[in-house]
Amino acid sequence: MHQETILNYLKEIKPYYEKKGFIIEGLFGSYARDEATEKSDIDILIEIKKNTSDIYAKKSALKKDLEAYFQKKVDIARRKYLTPLAKDVIKDDLIHV
């Protein structure tokens, strides 16, 4: 799996998920750093718009869609819940879409 493949797909689906209240911010972690191995998961940073309903179900659907497309484990991090340390680490890796 190549970084470009992931970024292109995230850009493609971003408008669809924004209509559902999810803002796909970008890719971080080993794929963003070009250090991924076969065992690496894909790390995606999102935020959720205020007044979005059914957040858990929609987030689960997003994760399921991404894992089906990429055939890899996907971790979805929500900016709102990141610790200051995690935010600091991610800011250096994050590739915005």
Describe the residue ranges of each PLM region:
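Conserved histidines in hydrophobic membrane contexts and catalytic metal-binding motifs
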Residues: 27
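Catalytic core of pol beta-like nucleotidyltransferases
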Residues: 1-24, 32-38, 49-97
